[in-house]
Amino acid sequence: MAKVFTQLQYYPEAIILAQEVHYSGLKKLILEIKEKTTSPPDWNKFSGKVSINEPTTSKSKSKSTSTSTSTSTSTSTSTSTSSSTSSTSSTTSSINK
């Protein structure tokens, strides 16, 4: 079968004429092979066996643009003032003489 199909690609008319004498169903078989390889598959044949998404004929174009900008500014100012006051205590002692 593979040999017939390979030869069909290169010598289609010669193969049909020469081999039809030896195998009467060859022409029908070759036509079936041609039909299966050139026609779209019968999707109804596969229903229930496998899940096939059939292509849709309508064309829809959708364009989605999303832009997100995030700006975060954090300013922290810390001012610490420490003042220290020292008091001087003077003791005056008077000596009474």
Curated annotation (Swiss-Prot):
Record field: compositional bias (Low complexity): 56-97
Region called Disordered, residue ranges: 38-97
Protein name: Putative uncharacterized protein DDB_G0268082
Source organism (scientific name): Dictyostelium discoideum
